């Protein structure tokens, strides 16, 4: 949701049409004399995928490169993820990633693991972890609060959780926990 393509010749900016809840871990030119690029991506439920795409194509179709065997979590089809925005203590919207079983019941009885890191402008992007997927498969909910101090929304977001504004970082985490309670993911 944060990726854009910038044409350096024209300055034109367009969205990078990629599956939601995936992280582009690497993008580089396929060769200097065409518009193709190498792409490595992963997601909350998808191991790293190596592929290439042609920037000249409007839909940017992805072609998988078969030189690496893909390993996916065996029960990944039972797990999904979504991105929500949680209103912070001061009204600012905090991006939050939620990874959960597709058959999750919102009954306030779920075990929830909340992770948040907001410092040095570091962004916590979607990453693949069979260990966390195993926890989710057993019924837990994994939540990443992209709190201020991190880099998810640029330098202003980083500075909004730095030095004098550092309390925003843990207040964002508290707001996320309260949202999870209010929306019956879990209880205190």
Located regions from the model:
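Short flexible coil/turn linkers enriched for glycine and charged/polar residues
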Residues: 10, 33, 44-45, 90-93
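Conserved beta-propeller blade repeats
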Residues: 1, 21-40, 80-83, 129-133, ...
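Cap/lid segment of the alpha/beta-hydrolase catalytic domain
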Residues: 67-188
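Multi-bladed beta-propeller domains
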Residues: 8-26, 56-79, 183
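Structural motif
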Residues: 1-5, 45-53
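Cytosolic C-terminal regulatory domains/tails of membrane transporters and channels
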Residues: 34-36, 51-54
